[in-house]
Structure formats: structure tokens, C-alpha cells
């Protein structure tokens, strides 16, 4: 896969990584009531995340469907997306590097989670209550811009807010060395 072609990333790697996270939670749930509760919540998730990659001759849209907690990349969404992520081809290499196999891992770092974000039915309900768009920008090094649209009909709107984060600050957030409030309040 080249930096200019995100197909394998969104069609194969992201769903495979997501499903490995569910597999790991299934193993953790054996004999652990709290891990079982979390797994049950993860398995109740049914929804769609769309990713739109702009640039090139046409924009590409990937439908990442989640059924019973497991993700697949499909030709059509199973539901209206609760989250639409938009980025261009020029920043794909940075996004791929910063997120590893999971774009939600990238977003989880911004929320202060050092590990993989585990989407539960409760978290999904909270996301469904959101309506708006935000632009996330990594600055310094290899810059990157990602727009996240939450809620119906927000994809047509421009971002309602922008977050600019230096790459070194993001690295500290991702490693769990810096709390989000410290990063954002510290400027």
C-alpha cells in the first residue's frame, strides 16, 4: 500500500485491528465479570463510521459497519453514520502513521485514552447525541488535517471548531503522558 492509496488501510487493516480488539476483550472476559460487562457493551454496538478521502480524481468513501461489535468494510452503510471522518490524500501518510491500524485510536488519544478506544453501546448513544463538526490539525513535522462530523446532516456544514495540536503534544497524549485538559488549557 502506498501513502497515496488508503484502500487497504480502510478496507482491511482498520476492520482487522478493530476485530482483534474485540477478540482480546473476549479472552479477557473469561472469568472476569467486569471484562465480560465491557464485552457485552461492545457487542451491543450496531452502527456505521464513514471515512471520506478527498483529492485525486474522485473522493473515496469507506463504510465501516459495526454489527454485534465487529467491524467490516462494506459497499453500503448498514445505518446512517454516527461519525464521518474526512481527510485528503496528502495527509493520509501522517494519519496512517499516527493512528497505527485504527483511526479511533487516533481520536482516543485526543480524548486521553492511551490505548485503543473501545466503542460500547453507551458511548455510541453519547455520540449519537452530538451534532456538529470539528477540524483536528496536527502541526509541526508532517502536518495533518482531519474533519470529524458528528450527527445527521453535519457533513454539509463546515467545522464548528478547530483544534490545532503540535505533533509532540499529540505524542504525549497518545502515550498517556499528558492529560487532555493539560494539553488544551496549556495552549
Annotated model-derived regions:
Residues 1-186:
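Feature captures hydrophobic
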Amino acid at each position: 500500500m502506498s501513502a497515496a492509496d488508503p484502500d487497504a488501510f480502510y478496507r482491511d487493516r482498520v476492520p482487522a485491528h478493530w476485530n482483534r480488539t474485540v477478540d482480546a476483550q473476549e479472552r479477557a472476559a473469561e472469568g472476569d465479570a467486569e471484562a465480560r460487562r465491557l464485552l457485552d457493551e461492545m457487542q451491543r454496538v450496531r452502527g456505521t463510521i464513514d471515512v471520506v478521502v478527498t483529492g485525486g480524481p474522485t473522493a473515496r468513501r469507506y463504510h465501516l459497519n459495526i454489527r454485534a461489535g465487529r467491524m467490516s468494510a462494506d459497499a453500503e452503510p448498514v445505518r446512517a453514520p454516527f461519525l464521518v471522518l474526512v481527510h485528503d490524500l496528502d495527509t493520509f501518510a501522517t494519519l496512517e502513521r499516527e493512528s497505527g491500524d485504527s483511526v479511533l485510536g487516533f481520536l482516543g488519544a485526543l480524548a486521553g485514552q492511551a490505548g485503543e478506544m473501545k466503542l460500547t453501546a453507551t458511548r455510541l448513544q453519547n455520540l449519537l447525541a452530538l451534532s456538529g463538526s470539528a477540524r483536528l490539525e496536527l502541526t509541526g513535522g508532517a502536518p495533518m488535517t482531519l474533519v470529524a462530523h458528528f450527527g445527521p446532516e453535519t457533513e454539509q456544514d463546515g467545522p464548528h471548531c478547530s483544534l490545532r495540536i503540535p505533533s509532540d503534544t499529540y505524542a504525549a497524549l497518545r502515550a498517556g503522558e499528558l492529560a487532555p485538559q493539560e494539553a488544551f488549557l496549556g495552549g
